[in-house]
From Swiss-Prot:
Name this protein carries in UniProt: Probable lipid kinase YegS
Gene Ontology molecular function, alphabetical: ATP binding; lipid kinase activity; magnesium ion binding
Residues that bind Mg(2+): L215, D218, L220
Protein's job: Probably phosphorylates lipids; the in vivo substrate is unknown.
Disulfide-bonded cysteines: none
Catalytic residues identified in the record: E271 (proton acceptor)
Amino acid sequence: MAEFPASLLILNGKSTDNLPLREAIMLLREEGMTIHVRVTWEKGDAARYVEEARKLGVATVIAGGGDGTINEVSTALIQCEGDDIPALGILPLGTANDFATSVGIPEALDKALKLAIAGNAIAIDMAQVNKQTCFINMATGGFGTRITTETPEKLKAALGGVSYIIHGLMRMDTLQPDRCEIRGENFHWQGDALVIGIGNGRQAGGGQQLCPNALINDGLLQLRIFTGDEIIPTLVSTLKSDEDNPNIIEGASSWFDIQAPHEITFNLDGEPLSGQNFHIEILPAALRCRLPPDCPLLR
């Protein structure tokens, strides 16, 4: 096997007992690959390990976990200054793995690891909210956010992405739309939104294609708003992604401003952010990510 530069795997602490992963790493090490492993325990660990990775001179920092872990690692990478910033590799080990699935990362651990180490590094966009918090995949608001943030961890562990839908059906009687106003380049809308999706990536909530036209290297954010007076018909239309549905409003812009008369919550790659005013902007070519050659989210 050809020689490859060293990599550092930042592993979510929930995956430390993953025996197949341990075996895959040992096998690649036996084949001559240098793979450092660090385990996260609390918020801030990923940023410290990215700094350590730079001191070690590795070519790739691999995010081993779900969308939240990918978010933490990618955010730490774009905050690095100087040259020789490592590329991002992705090892999907979370509940839904929405970003990894949509960009075509293999499910098999050994194949995903090899791609993360030796795949072609391509410049991709990220998004930033209120000049502080970032997301690589999607910001979701309204119905979808309350479901994903409130779904019990045990239910997610047992059922994966389906758990979000089940929990949503159980909470139908308490869910209300969010009144807000959204502006962007050549875009303006105000009204009651049941679901808001602002995507750099395409899917969230365990596989739902909220922004099916999104690309991760086009310098744009895709917006989809689901409106309507009734939760269940709108949820069904969300699952079907019916392009002719009058309750679906779409837009594309390099930025969006959102204002609400009351506090609303957005879910940024799994992390909630609450407020009444949000400025969301794209950060073009913010980092390099090792992706498969047939990645469907590249233009």
